[in-house]
Amino acid sequence: KMESLLEEFGLNHIRKNRGDLLSGGERRRTEIARALATDPKFVLLDEPFAGVDPVAVEDIQRIIAHLKNKNIGILITDHNVQETLAITDKTYLMFEGGVLKAGIPEELAADTMVRKVYLGQNFELRKTKLEF
């Protein structure tokens, strides 16, 4: 299983490296591969886009789309709104301990209260949703 995950996530070249020497993107791919080692039906990704460069963000988005295509459920908690909304089917915006709004990204971006308390009035959703 480990061999196939290393191959699938392009991690063969770092298989002997110490964790503290990995880039942010390599670290994220390693974390996701490790989570998949038990063949889960559902994965929680906490801040997957934090601390990684734009190329790594796109790589992680591709991985998430790949997991979705394998029928693995994904729950993402992240403050990087553009990156997250670009790949989600349904979004729940939490505010003060509860769900402020749930819906597709376009619904959240258009909601007056969501803009007031979280997104800001100048927020613009990407024109097209990322497809991988």
Question: Which residues fall in each region the model found?
Answer:
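Hydrophobic anchor residue at the start of the ABC signature
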Residues: 32
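Conserved ABC ATPase signature
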Residues: 18-22, 26
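Catalytic Walker B motif of ABC-type/P-loop ATPase nucleotide-binding domains
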Residues: 43-47
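A short, surface-exposed alpha-helical micro-motif characterized by mixed small hydrophobic
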Residues: 84-86
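Conserved catalytic motifs of ABC-family nucleotide-binding domains
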Residues: 39
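Conserved ABC ATPase "signature" region
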Residues: 1-14, 61-65
